[in-house]
């Protein structure tokens, strides 16, 4: 038998099981959840929304969406233009949507679900799939 095995066996027998202690975390690391920390049924927000944080900067996502009047104008432009000859205002709007991580499969979540925005959604989908990487 090798000397290292003998030393290891003696250390295990003399000092208890060191390997078993290493497998279990220390008791001071374990914490219990309080009764008021249980699962809640309320809606949770993953963003911090306090005034100090929002004083100067808006999120890219919020900045990408124009007001109702501008949105109506863009929807009208989408009705009158073809997908391969979009105006610069529509291209810029689509680029802003892309920067805000909006894509054709989740655009309906951002309020573009009405019939008046149907053509705008179609133009955005075509631009996103075919023209986004070219420009």
Swiss-Prot record:
Induction: Expression is induced during host plant infection. Its main location: secreted. Keywords: Host cytoplasm, Host nucleus, Secreted, Signal, Virulence. GO terms for cellular component: extracellular region; host cell cytoplasm; host cell nucleus. It is found in: Secreted; Host nucleus; Host cytoplasm. It comes from the Eukaryota. A motif (RxLR-dEER) lies at residues 44-63. Residues 34-64 are annotated as: Disordered. Residues 34-43 have a biased composition (Polar residues). Belongs to the RxLR effector family. This is RxLR effector protein Avr10. It comes from Phytophthora infestans (strain T30-4). The gene is Avr10.
């Amino acid at each position: 038998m090798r000397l290292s095995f003998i030393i290891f066996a003696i250390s295990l027998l003399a000092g208890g099981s060191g390997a078993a202690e290493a497998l279990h975390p220390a008791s001071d690391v374990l914490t219990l959840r309080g009764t008021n920390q249980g699962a809640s049924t309320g809606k949770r927000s993953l963003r911090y929304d306090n005034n100090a944080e929002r004083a100067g900067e808006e999120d890219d996502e919020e900045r990408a969406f124009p007001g109702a009047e501008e949105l109506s104008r863009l929807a009208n432009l989408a009705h009158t233009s073809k997908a391969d000859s979009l105006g610069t205002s529509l291209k810029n709007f689509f680029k802003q949507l892309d920067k805000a991580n909006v894509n054709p499969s989740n655009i309906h979540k951002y309020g573009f679900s009405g019939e008046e925005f149907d053509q705008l959604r179609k133009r955005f989908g075509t631009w996103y799939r075919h023209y986004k990487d070219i420009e």
